[in-house]
Amino acid sequence: MNIRMVLLASAAAFAASTPVLAADAIVAAEPEPVEYVRVCDAYGTGYFYIPGTETCLKIEGYIRFQVNVGDNPGGDNDSDWDAVTAVRFSSRKSDTEYGPLTGVIVMQFNADNASDQDAILDSAYLDVAGFRAGLFYSWWDDGLSGETDDIGSVVTLHNSIRYQYESGTFYAGLSVDELEDGVYQGTFTPGVIPGTTDFTADDGPNNVGVAFGIGGTAGAFSYQVTGGWDVDNEDGAIRAMGTVEIGPGTFGLAGVYSSGPNSYYSSAEWAVAAEYAIKATDKLKITPGRWHGHVPEDFDGLGDAWKVGLTVDYQIVENFYAKASVQYLDPQDGEDSTSGYFACSVRSNHLVDAPGLRIGSTTISF
């Protein structure tokens, strides 16, 4: 009896000491944070990881509207001005045992008017351990910073295989180029203004060229030597170019020699160009320049020709730029001409938005 009373008393005491609770409410679990986009800073700004991979992707491009002024700048009518619009856009990198593997695709869409539009593949190539193969621009596409120099190829975009060695600020490379849209024997038309005429043949025979490029920087001085041999035309060209910081600006000088009209250089037998890019203020750069070339009959037959010009770059506000250029060309045995253009551009590093993250870059010009 006593044991039963003790057990009942203990049970009553335990029940009294236990609080009465209602049924537990349903509480939603906190969502797991999801990392949609990860920044990839191994190759510079603008790259992000493709989700689920260790491959870095960069999406960039521009939209550009530009008005050109001159003698028939459009080439299809007698107008002295022409407006064109172009859109370009990507690059991808990943690490390999041989170093970074880079893949680049650049598409460009052009519109001269509502009925004259096209889309082209501007670049597409693979690059690893100094080897590059695909469609890309050659060293002959480089030039001085202004718009007066005429020291480059008419066509600089080729299907090529290239190896470029780099060490610090020095590089040296060799490329084999397909010159299918270059200058050909029997198709060259003399009597035109150098640098303003398309010397290419439509879907010409596959031609082969070999080019080299050497360049680098040393303090305030930068330099580049470029050469090319056009196998079918059996002619070649070589060019030297350098810049040095002097006073409030940068002085640039270039010279080029061509043994005959070829796909690497066809504007003149020889030419020299000089400019001085004056940094007037933090926002304003003024670049006067001069070009002089000897153009014999087997090139354009214009004799000696010279050109002077002025290019002005101005940063209106952050990421908003304006550019204007005017050029005057006076050939000895041809008519003089004046040309120029004006463009404004908005540049931004914001193409892709994610929570707390913005990726890519774009330029809008008009």
From Swiss-Prot:
Family matches, as SUPFAM superfamilies: Porins (SSF56935)
Record-linked InterPro entries: Porin_alphabac
Signal peptide range in chain numbering: 1-22
GO BP of this protein: monoatomic ion transport
Post-translational modification: Attached covalently to peptidoglycan.
Record's keyword terms, sorted: Cell outer membrane, Ion transport, Membrane, Porin, Signal, Transmembrane, Transmembrane beta strand, Transport
GO molecular function, one term: porin activity
Keyword Aminoacyl-tRNA synthetase included in the entry's annotation: no
Main location: membrane
Gene Ontology cellular component annotations, sorted alphabetically: cell outer membrane; pore complex
Compartment list: Cell outer membrane
Task of the protein: May act as an outer membrane pore.
Family, per entry: Belongs to the alphaproteobacteria porin family.
Record note on quaternary structure: Forms calcium-stabilized oligomers.
Protein name as it appears in the record: Outer membrane protein IIIA
Taxonomic source organism: Rhizobium leguminosarum bv. viciae
Lineage: Bacteria, Pseudomonadati, Pseudomonadota, Alphaproteobacteria, Hyphomicrobiales
